[in-house]
Regions:
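Short secondary-structure junctions
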Residues: 98-106
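Immediate N-terminus of the mature polypeptide
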Residues: 1-91, 95, 107, 112-146
């Protein structure tokens, strides 16, 4: 009888109720807790949503010591609004999330152009890894600024 592979062993460990991780990040509004006066934090789904949003809005060379991290969507916003441009925008967002956000399992990205307001409505659908959750939707409005 063959022995289980390492992937199956790791998957069984990840599905175990003993392996529950809590993802946390700093609250970027820097709101102080009323009792301890510490900076509050965001956890789990909210932390991953904030990280995905930051990755979408981050340009290359904006993160110190990591010039490779960034989506580069600002350059696309100045291109003519066509279905091809919307597809390229969605593809760049998919790439940055798949490469730099290990806490999210991406389901899909939709970029819908709003020609009247010169903006894109980008919807990112993903699951938060460990603990598995329901489908998370993140909608970001992208518009060009001069």
């Amino acid at each position: 009888m063959p022995t289980p592979t390492a992937h199956k062993d790791a998957q069984a460990f990840n599905d175990s109720p003993r392996n529950v991780r809590t993802y946390s990040d700093l609250d970027l509004f820097f709101a102080a807790k009323s009792v301890s006066k510490d900076i509050s934090k965001v956890t789990d789904i909210q932390a991953v949503k904030r990280s995905v949003r930051n990755l979408v809005l981050l340009n290359h060379y904006e993160k110190p010591f990591h010039p490779e991290i960034g989506s580069g969507v600002r350059g696309i916003l100045f291109e003519p609004m066509t279905p091809i441009t919307a597809h390229v925008l969605a593809r760049k967002i998919e790439e940055v999330i798949e490469n730099f956000e290990p806490r999210a399992r991406l389901v899909g990205v939709r970029a819908q152009p709003n020609l009247d307001r010169n903006e894109y409505e980008v919807t990112v659908e993903f699951y938060v890894i460990n603990p598995p959750t329901e489908l998370v939707d993140l909608t970001v409005m992208l518009e060009r600024l001069r």
